[in-house]
Amino acid sequence: MANLRIIKRRIRSVRNIAKITRAMEMIAASKMKKAQERGLAGRPYSEKITEVIAALAALPQSGEILHPLLERRPVKKIAILHITPDRGQCGGLVANINRKTGTFIMEQKVSVSAVVVGRKGVDFIRRIRQQMRAEFINLGDKPDYLDTLPISRVIMDDFMSGEIDQVFIAYTQFVSTAIQNPVLEQLLPVVPVEFPPGQNLEYIYEPESAAVLNSLLPRFVEMSVYHAILESIASEQSARMVAMRNATDNAKELIGELTLVYNKARQESITNELLDIVGGAAALA
């Protein structure tokens, strides 16, 4: 009987866990839809401003750097903007982006400092004892553009002051509900796009291209950071929904297995009791 009580208690415990994971799955699904809409809505603007900036940076220059954010210099120190969730329970997403950043840091032959978004990233950078320039946590599930400006400002100030010579950004790109890819890209200096020979850029700049570039470049960095954070949030909620769905399915499967074990144990217990009764009756006869 004691064994039956233990099994029954475990079934009840797993059933309660299944209720929790099911609720978390539904919450994540709701947040995922909103995060996907925000992330996908910003993609066209992000892609177009990237195209314009890259085209401007590719224009012939008269020996003078058009903007400090375009300056290329010998790389003595690198910064990486590492974007992760604040919370776990989202499958392998956190491990994948941390592994991407960790591998990148190990491969560098120069000093690397990290600007970290998300508590999971902060914990990781501290665990590997890497220099951390700044940390930003608790941005929430729906940060707006203004919430991310301090992150962009740290990066741009350090680059323009010469504290760092190159900036990379690591985040999780949303592909679909089931697929989220860890991505690592160069953010600064801006890499000019290579156009095929003879291709017309098809842009007429008013005022002159240098003025447009000076105005757009800071916005480009800010938008790139903001868009990467939105992509990471959409990926996080998608991964969490899938993880909680798998946890719920596993819990249901475990409940079925435990119920089968419970029924077999109960049947065995009843059979033993009947045998004891029959044996006792036979002894009295």
Swiss-Prot record:
Keywords: ATP synthesis, Cell membrane, CF(1), Hydrogen ion transport, Ion transport, Membrane, Transport. GO terms for biological process: proton motive force-driven plasma membrane ATP synthesis. It is found in: Cell membrane. Disulfide bonds: none annotated. One of its GO terms (cellular component) is plasma membrane. The keyword Transport applies. The keyword Ribonucleoprotein does not apply. It holds the Pfam family ATP-synt. GO terms for molecular function: ATP binding; proton-transporting ATP synthase activity, rotational mechanism. InterPro entries: ATP_synth_F1_ATPase_gsu, ATP_synth_F1_gsu, ATP_synth_F1_gsu_CS. Gene3D superfamilies: 3.40.1380.10, ATP synthase, gamma subunit, helix hairpin domain. It is a peripheral membrane protein. It comes from the Bacteria. PANTHER family: ATP SYNTHASE GAMMA CHAIN, ATP SYNTHASE SUBUNIT GAMMA, MITOCHONDRIAL. Belongs to the ATPase gamma chain family. Produces ATP from ADP in the presence of a proton gradient across the membrane. The gamma chain is believed to be important in regulating ATPase activity and the flow of protons through the CF(0) complex. F-type ATPases have 2 components, CF(1) - the catalytic core - and CF(0) - the membrane proton channel. CF(1) has five subunits: alpha(3), beta(3), gamma(1), delta(1), epsilon(1). CF(0) has three main subunits: a, b and c. This is ATP synthase gamma chain. The gene is atpG.
